[in-house]
Amino acid sequence: MAVPKKRTSTSKKRIRKNIWKKKGYWTALKAFSLGKSLSTGNSKSFFVQQTNK
């Protein structure tokens, strides 16, 4: 079983954690932006059939 040789420093751990958090933030922002464009009808990547009532 693979075991790390030395302890990871606190700063390196914090940097990696922040990178991981930032990825989630950008993914959420993209999803929100896509949902917003779908709701306003400005989406160019999805074709939503509009129903007239």
From Swiss-Prot:
GO BP terms: translation
SUPFAM superfamilies listed in its UniProt record: Zn-binding ribosomal proteins
GO molecular function, one term: structural constituent of ribosome
Pfam family for this entry, one: Ribosomal_L32p
Keyword hit for Nucleotide-binding: no
InterPro entries: Ribosomal_bL32, Ribosomal_bL32_plant/cyanobact, Ribosomal_zn-bd
Cellular component annotations (GO), alphabetically ordered: chloroplast; large ribosomal subunit
Compartments, record wording: Plastid, Chloroplast
Keywords linked to the UniProt accession: Chloroplast, Plastid, Ribonucleoprotein, Ribosomal protein
Recorded family membership: Belongs to the bacterial ribosomal protein bL32 family.
PANTHER family per UniProt: 50S RIBOSOMAL PROTEIN L32, CHLOROPLASTIC, LARGE RIBOSOMAL SUBUNIT PROTEIN BL32C
This protein's name: Large ribosomal subunit protein bL32c
Name of encoding gene: rpl32
